[in-house]
Amino acid sequence: MFTPVRRRVRTAALALSAAAALVLGSTAASGASATPSPAPAPAPAPVKQGPTSVAYVEVNNNSMLNVGKYTLADGGGNAFDVAVIFAANINYDTGTKTAYLHFNENVQRVLDNAVTQIRPLQQQGIKVLLSVLGNHQGAGFANFPSQQAASAFAKQLSDAVAKYGLDGVDFDDEYAEYGNNGTAQPNDSSFVHLVTALRANMPDKIISLYNIGPAASRLSYGGVDVSDKFDYAWNPYYGTWQVPGIALPKAQLSPAAVEIGRTSRSTVADLARRTVDEGYGVYLTYNLDGGDRTADVSAFTRELYGSEAVRTP
């Protein structure tokens, strides 16, 4: 039996940038829409058959461009299909008692330099998502006090996607520390209102669920179930197999989760093989860094796509 491993580096949740916070806060407060910066149409990527592969990147320490360096030896397709910027935060303004979207200086740098840090991946055919994470301040996806408050935060998210030309948003309900700063505990309506509003704002973008925290277990309220508003959901425990508890088809689920460089290659391969054997359509990886991870990536590409991976330095 695999031992659950949860080693996400928390510096993305802890490193604060007042300037970035003020910029986002003032935009939200004024109600001004961000100027759209649409992603360019990707160049036709070599066709590959098999599950969608996902790479989370800790941008406090690593470059998003590493995701595009790995391709398949057979056919030249991308080893990774989705790259996730880890991570923006949901913060709490104690003065206005409202949640707001916050970017630390490293996330802000990636977004500000989208032309060089994001567009090359998109032009290669890789989707780029923004992960949003709690920040120990009591604000989270599961404790908005009203539909209006949830919708206001959804607008901040969709404005950021439009402004920076992203392909979608990933929800990760960790480190919120509900109750801090006098905030409320999770309620049943909050996440439903948030996801409903976000999907209405960006009907053609990706919304994914890191299947953890109070939000992940509160997907229905008042006769509304938001499960089908997600494009993907994945297991959050690296080195394990756990089917996300959400009503999505197998093609949109990743029961497998691995941490590159920490999960053994044999386990990486076993989980990839099981993904194919049991008909699941997504394979999640975390913490791709700037080292040569060809052997680690090949451990799953052999099973998912029948090919070794190659790395372009």
Swiss-Prot record:
Gene Ontology MF terms: mannosyl-glycoprotein endo-beta-N-acetylglucosaminidase activity
UniProt KW keywords: Glycosidase, Hydrolase, Signal
EC number of this enzyme: 3.2.1.96
Species name: Streptomyces plicatus
Pfam families, alphabetized: Glyco_hydro_18
One GO cellular component, as annotated: extracellular region
UniProt-annotated catalytic positions: 174 (proton donor)
Highest taxon in the source lineage: Bacteria
Family according to the record: Belongs to the glycosyl hydrolase 18 family.
Annotated effect of mutating residue 174 to D/Q: 0.05% activity
Gene3D superfamilies named among the record's database cross-references: Glycosidases
Protein name: Endo-beta-N-acetylglucosaminidase H
Reactions the enzyme catalyzes: an N(4)-(oligosaccharide-(1->3)-[oligosaccharide-(1->6)]-beta-D-Man-(1->4)-beta-D-GlcNAc-(1->4)-alpha-D-GlcNAc)-L-asparaginyl-[protein] + H2O = an oligosaccharide-(1->3)-[oligosaccharide-(1->6)]-beta-D-Man-(1->4)-D-GlcNAc + N(4)-(N-acetyl-beta-D-glucosaminyl)-L-asparaginyl-[protein]
Ranges of residues in domain GH18: 51-307
Signal sequence range: 1-42
Function statement: Cleaves asparagine-linked oligomannose and hybrid, but not complex, oligosaccharides from glycoproteins.
